[in-house]
Each structure stands twice: as structure tokens, then as C-alpha cells.
């Protein structure tokens, strides 16, 4: 396994960050300590962010340009309104604002953002939501007078929505600019689709993407033991209502 761990990281060795890793490995090879133990230690150190950044830089070449996105969108047979429902509770402004701005930056424009504050006690959270309320007709904000917890608060956010598809986004999530575009492109390939889920990753405090979670195609056996759907998920409205919403 150790051998394959090294081989899997070879592309990184030719990057700037990879050279540092290689130097670390070589210096440890000539030390008096056990080679296998030392190599394992190097490979287990936090180089994952650098490796993932290398992967993302390569994938960036595959991203469609603005003109390509416009061309695709104009050709779409289906251009559904996507309602993004987001329950909010005591979220720091820096994360909540990033979530809102990420939605506003979407390349697919037929969306609405439905924010329901679950009786936050953080004045920072309340003030920010008040500051954006009624500033954009596509952004709906409502305030609860009691804490209902996430399931019922999500239902309250859903009550603000009108779209034929709903998207689930946490108050501290940030969407890729083409997230909704990719969702609608998939819907146009299969107009009977009811549920879409995506890969996800995390952001460091400095804004670097890390800890990718690459998900399989739908796997009923895996799903029995691992709820890998989560973020980012998009559900047809009628199916969500038929299921009885969140409970």
C-alpha cells in the first residue's frame, strides 16, 4: 500500500510543492530511522491540500467559458427556477455573506434564495440578514420567533420557495459559480430526473479548497450505511412534497 501511495503522488512531485515533499522524503531515506515508518509519516502529513490544488488547476482547463455557458443556456429546453433553501442559525457574517454572494455569482441566473432565520441569538447574523432583506427580489428572508431546529427551519425556508426544483444549501456553504448551470444541464439531458447530488469539498480559512469528497453513482448498498448525498443536493419539488418534506 505504501508503494501505491507514493506512486499516486508522483504527479505532484513535479510541482513546486511536490519538490518540497520529495526533498523531505530523500532526507528521511538517509536518516538512521526505519525507512517505512519515516516514509509513512511524510505521506501522512498535510500535503493533501497541495495535491488537491494541483488536481483543481488541471480541471480548470475543462471549465466552460462565459460564452460557452451562454450558448448552452440559450439552447436549454428546460430552464427551471431553482429555489435554494437555507436555514440560518447564528452563522458568522463572513460565512453567511460568502454563501449569499456565491449564489448571486451563479452563471445560471434563474434561481431564488430562501433564507429562514431560526431565531438566531447572534446579533451579527440578524443584522446581516436584515441588511439584505428586500434588496434583491430573488433573495427572500424570513425570521422565526422560536428555535425550531434544522428540519423544521428548512421546511419554513421551503415555504418561501416557488421553484420546480429545490436545492439544499447550509448557511456556511459556498457554491461553485457553475453549480446551478451543471445541475440544469443535467436536467436537460434527462427531464425525468428527480434528485441530483454532487461531489463536495471544504474551504480553509484562507479560501483554499481541501478535503474533497468524491461520490459514486447511486449505490443502494452503500447508501444503507452511508448518507453520502448531503451537499449539494437538488430535488424536484413535487417529489419533496410527496415525501412529506423534512421530519
Predicted regions located by residue number:
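Short aromatic/hydrophobic "clamp" motif used to bind/position activated sugar donors
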Residues: 166
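Conserved nucleotide-sugar donor-binding catalytic segment
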Residues: 220-247
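Conserved donor NDP-sugar-binding/catalytic core segment of glycosyltransferases
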Residues: 174, 178-210
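Catalytic metal- and UDP-sugar-binding loop of GT-A-like glycosyltransferases, i.e.
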Residues: 144, 169-171
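Acidic donor-binding segment of Leloir-type glycosyltransferases
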Residues: 104-146
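Acidic metal-phosphate-binding loop of nucleotide-sugar-dependent transferases
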Residues: 119, 148, 173-174, 200
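Glycine-rich, basic loop-to-helix element that forms the pyrophosphate-binding segment
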Residues: 144-161
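N-proximal low-complexity "stem/linker" segments adjacent to membrane-targeting elements
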Residues: 27-104
Amino acid at each position: 500500500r505504501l508503494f501505491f501511495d507514493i506512486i499516486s503522488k508522483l504527479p505532484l512531485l513535479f510541482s513546486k510543492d511536490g519538490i518540497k515533499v520529495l526533498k523531505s522524503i530523500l532526507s528521511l531515506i538517509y536518516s538512521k530511522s526505519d525507512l517505512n515508518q519515516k516514509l509513512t509519516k511524510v505521506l501522512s502529513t498535510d500535503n493533501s491540500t497541495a495535491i488537491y490544488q494541483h488536481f483543481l488547476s488541471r480541471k480548470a482547463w475543462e471549465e466552460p467559458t462565459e460564452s460557452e455557458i451562454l450558448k448552452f443556456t440559450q439552447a436549454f429546453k428546460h430552464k427551471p427556477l431553482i429555489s435554494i433553501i437555507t436555514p440560518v442559525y447564528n452563522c458568522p457574517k463572513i460565512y453567511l455573506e460568502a454563501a449569499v454572494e456565491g449564489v448571486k455569482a451563479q452563471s445560471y441566473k434563474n434561481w431564488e434564495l430562501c433564507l429562514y432565520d431560526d431565531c438566531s441569538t447572534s446579533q451579527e447574523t440578524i443584522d446581516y440578514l436584515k441588511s439584505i432583506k428586500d434588496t434583491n427580489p430573488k433573495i427572500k428572508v424570513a425570521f422565526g420567533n422560536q428555535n425550531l431546529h434544522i428540519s423544521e427551519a428548512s421546511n419554513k425556508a421551503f415555504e418561501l420557495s416557488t421553484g420546480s426544483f429545490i436545492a439544499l444549501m447550509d448557511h456556511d456553504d459556498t457554491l461553485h459559480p457553475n453549480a446551478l448551470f451543471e445541475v440544469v444541464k443535467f436536467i436537460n439531458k434527462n427531464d425525468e430526473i428527480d434528485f441530483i447530488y454532487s461531489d463536495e469539498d471544504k474551504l480553509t480559512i484562507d479560501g483554499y479548497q481541501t478535503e474533497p469528497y468524491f461520490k459514486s453513482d447511486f449505490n443502494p448498498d452503500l447508501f444503507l450505511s452511508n448518507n453520502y448525498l448531503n451537499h449539494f443536493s437538488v430535488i424536484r419539488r413535487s417529489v419533496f412534497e410527496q415525501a412529506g418534506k423534512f421530519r
